[in-house]
Amino acid sequence: MEYMILIHSDESYEAPTPGTPEFEEFMGAFLAYNQSLIDGGHWISAANLQPSMTATTVRKSFGAASTVVDGPYAESKEQLGGYYVVSAADLDEVIALVEALPIPMASFEIRPIAFRPDAG
């Protein structure tokens, strides 16, 4: 079964600066984690999102014109920062994958994928 892991984190957290040893260690942990997903047959896709200040929200209502506003849908300290789509036997396996993610502080929302048009 396929699952989406939504990663919500505090945007005030500052990741290590590119070019520093801390950044290399930080990125190395993610590359190793991603490779472990690939090697384990779990990898489908993943992406890191731009900060919420770059978001645009479009609200639609039946019979009414759409409303377009700058910013995320919800104003919150924790914002959607990225996601993974993984293949796993069950929810327990996905939880184990999330627990291995090299992110020190975040909330992870796991949702089963009902349908993906490009799935084989």
What does each model-identified segment do?
Residues M1-G120:
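Conserved, structured core segments of small domains
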